């Protein structure tokens, strides 16, 4: 019986490490994006630019990123809906199978 607990404990630990790894990879990816953003900003900004021109570039970039965030939110909602539909279908199939098995 203790080996079952050990297996469960190790499986939970493995899953926790997997989540931590994914979280860390996300942080690396996010920070790389920030570096790229700053590189892009440095490419656009020139020494002879006025303060208003620089602000215009930043506002434009901000609007672009806000649009991307909105697109990702919409995509996440669509994926969540698809997952719910699949879960519902699996439940239906499971119930049908139980009813079929019960009749035999």
Swiss-Prot record:
Key words, A-Z: Coiled coil, Cytoplasm
Signal peptide: none
Disulfide bonds: none
Protein's cellular compartments: Cytoplasm
Principal cellular location given in the protein's record: cytoplasm
Function: Pole-localizer protein involved in the regulation of several cellular processes.
NCBIfam families documented for this protein: PRK05423.1
Name of this protein: Pole-localizer protein TmaR
